[in-house]
Amino acid sequence: MNRWQWSEEIIEAAELDLSLFPEVRSSIDVIGEITNEAARETGLLAGTPVICGGGDGSCAGVGVGCVAPGTAYNYLGSSSWVALTVEKPIVDEQRRTMNWAHVVPGMLHPSGTMQAAGSSYNWMTLQHYFL
């Protein structure tokens, strides 16, 4: 994550070919434009730039203003996570957290997640612990 490129060591260990992987791009990079065919099918204007974009977690972070180093947020839906915005990866030796690329260039979102958060909240509601 420090070099913003695929790990050749991991790719070789998995016995894969680096040429199978796409170029690593920033979320704000223009990667193409709407073609005439896509414009006809979608109603979008031909030539409209297509931006690389980002994943749901880091886009949610932008939505709540978590864009500067040291800011954090908590997401609660079907799953739940707490994420922080940082410039360098935070490595948890026990692997309880992971680092995601932020949509803000050069930033990362180390986060910890619970995959059954929504179900847990629903169970508590059904047990009448919440009114």
Residue ranges and their predicted role:
Residues 1-15, 30, 36-131:
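Active-site core segments that coordinate phosphate-bearing ligands/cofactors
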Residues 22-30:
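Short linear loop/turn motifs
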